[in-house]
Amino acid sequence: IDRNFGGSVLLIGGLSLGGQILLEMLSRRKDLCRFAMVESAAVIPSKLTYSLIKPAFGSCYELIRQKWFSKLQFRSLRMKPELFNDYYQDTCGITKQNMIAFLQESSMYFMKKSLGECVAEIHLFVGERENKRILFSARKLHETLEKSNLHILPTMYHGEFSINHTDLYVKELCA
């Protein structure tokens, strides 16, 4: 962004971990972009989740590489069936250490106070059927960010908006 775009861009979007990364960027650079789209980003740390990740993935990591298990996991994410092959390839490409590291970091992410100084117009998207931690995070972000708009998406689960409803997502981008 600094080298190729003079230090700021029109819009940045992020889903889940990508949303956390975007929020971290905005907390460090209040004028990084004019608009931001944050979907399903958790900003409430969970020590319990953090402590369970290493033993859970330590014992079942090899299962993730099994296609039958990966299909079960994929179905639980409620993604379009035609995305499975990409999902499977991407998942198999992540090392055990990296998967544990990014899941643990994500589970402990918290909103920085400096995020409140962000000047971007931020659109927060969260599925109505997401877990409580994600829903509370969206509300907390909305309360903190003066120029934010909270969109609670009826009947949607985690990540469904940008992954399964790309047409609606693009309409929001263009709005």
Mark where each language-model region is:
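Flexible "cap/lid" loop of the alpha/beta hydrolase fold
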Residues: 27-28, 33-63
